[in-house]
């Protein structure tokens, strides 16, 4: 059971723009131009290709033992938000690219029926690029149009309007863009004077614009020729930016939609916490089925799941407490998600994510933290004054001294 969110509030965070400012959830269907190239046959069904491979190196050590797409925000895996957005866009056939964490992804998503979709799993032995994912999904995709969605991306408002626009106009490719302060960390688009996509670069050292590619792409079957025609990049990967550039060079119809609202790549802890904050602002408050004693104080937008127990504690929302978790003599501050089966006693925590089965006992203050599954956080002995740590590879720790 995952928390309900106020979709109207999410949709109101910000509109999108397709070479201009428009709201994707309210785009009116457009009449397709009659003089399309041969590839523009009548629009049929549309599929989705969701990428859930990737090593998640920026979320280590959490991703040493868990798929990055399954790290929860507001107690729901990031991947699930994407699958829900795809289903809301009317797409029911979904292929999921999986890598080393395939078993975990399969266990979480199943056959897709909980989302109203039918899932086909497509193994990718090595992370050889987004275009490689399209290449190996050829049998699943057939000649159908499709949306490619990166499983660790979060987009407020979903993609229904974007899909509707694409199905009406049917360009060969349509990409999502957003303005970012550090475009060198992303694929970057350069637009011409008329706002058309002129060129793309993958993580350029000297970006020619601040328009980064968001992890959602829409294609007709023409893209299959493109991914077969490109060579691996210096990274040894088949880049989707190179495939789209091939389409541009072949004078195919490539369009862009610029996001004016909220988008995050949840590939690092900072962005994960920021997305958690955004989603928590939409969670519907509820304490139904929870055991909250009279000594506890619940303030603001707080959701406490059934079976959770809160005693002698103060919880200030927006926050969520998972099922069967125990909060005793503790302070849980704003923008905190505590998963199921956790225990927080005689401690303070704020602006953090606590994963399933973790416990925090007797700790003065925890902030801006991501606590993994079944982690135990306790204070060190007062004397001698020392920090006792057991840290996994690539851990990052800030210690107050």
What are these regions (language model features)?
Residues 54, 152, 179, 268:
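Active-site glycine-centered loops adjacent to acidic/histidine catalytic or metal-binding residues
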Residues 70, 189-191, 256:
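A structural signal for short hydrophobic beta-strand segments in well-ordered beta-sheet cores
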Residues 26, 32, 196, 221-222, ...:
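Left-handed beta-helix
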Residues 2, 27, 32-50, 58-61, ...:
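Conserved N-terminal catalytic core of the sugar/cofactor nucleotidyltransferase
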Residues 2, 6-11, 19, 23, ...:
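Intrinsic-disorder-associated, low-complexity terminal segments enriched in Asp/Asn/His/Tyr and depleted
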Residues 155-234:
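Conserved core of the sugar-phosphate nucleotidyltransferase
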Residues 95-99, 176-177, 353, 370:
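Short internal beta-strands
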Residues 111-116, 191, 247-248:
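Short, conserved catalytic or adaptor-binding loops enriched in Gly and charged residues
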């Amino acid at each position: 059971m995952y928390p309900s969110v106020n979709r109207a509030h999410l949709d109101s965070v910000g509109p999108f723009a397709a070479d201009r400012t428009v709201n994707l959830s309210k785009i009116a269907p457009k009449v397709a131009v009659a003089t399309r190239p041969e590839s523009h046959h009548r629009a049929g069904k549309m599929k989705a290709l969701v990428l859930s491979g990737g090593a998640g190196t920026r979320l280590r050590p959490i991703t040493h033992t868990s798929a990055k797409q399954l790290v929860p925000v507001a107690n729901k895996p990031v991947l699930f938000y994407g699958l829900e957005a795809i289903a809301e866009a009317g797409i029911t056939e979904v292929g999921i690219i999986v890598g080393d964490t395939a078993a975990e992804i399969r266990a979480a998503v199943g056959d897709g029926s909980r989302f109203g979709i039918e899932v086909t799993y497509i193994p990718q032995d090595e992370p050889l690029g987004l275009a490689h994912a399209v290449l190996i999904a050829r049998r699943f995709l057939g000649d159908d149009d499709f949306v490619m969605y990166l499983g660790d991306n979060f987009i407020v408002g979903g993609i229904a309007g974007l899909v509707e626009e694409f199905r009406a106009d049917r360009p060969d490719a349509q990409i999502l863009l957003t303005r970012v302060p550090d475009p060198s960390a992303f694929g970057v688009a350069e637009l011409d004077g008329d706002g058309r996509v002129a060129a793309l670069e993958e993580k350029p050292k000297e970006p020619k614009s601040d328009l980064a590619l968001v992890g959602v792409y829409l294609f007709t079957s023409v893209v299959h020729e493109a991914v077969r025609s490109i060579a691996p990049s210096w990274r040894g990967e088949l880049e989707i930016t190179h495939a789209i550039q091939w389409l541009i060079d072949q004078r195919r119809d490539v369009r862009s939609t610029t996001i004016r609202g909220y988008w995050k790549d949840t590939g690092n802890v900072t962005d994960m916490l920021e997305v958690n904050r955004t989603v928590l602002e939409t969670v519907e408050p509820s304490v139904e089925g929870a055991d909250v004693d009279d000594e506890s104080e619940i303030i603001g937008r707080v959701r406490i799941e059934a079976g959770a127990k809160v005693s002698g504690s103060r919880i200030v929302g927006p926050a969520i407490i998972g099922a069967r978790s125990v909060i005793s003599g503790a302070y849980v501050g704003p923008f905190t998600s505590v998963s199921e089966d956790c225990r927080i006693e005689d401690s303070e925590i704020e602006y953090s994510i606590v994963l399933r089965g973790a416990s925090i006992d007797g700790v003065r203050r925890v902030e801006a933290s991501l606590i993994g599954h079944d982690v135990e956080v306790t204070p060190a002995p007062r004397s001698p004054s020392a920090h006792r740590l057991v840290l996994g590879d690539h851990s990052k720790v800030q210690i107050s001294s």
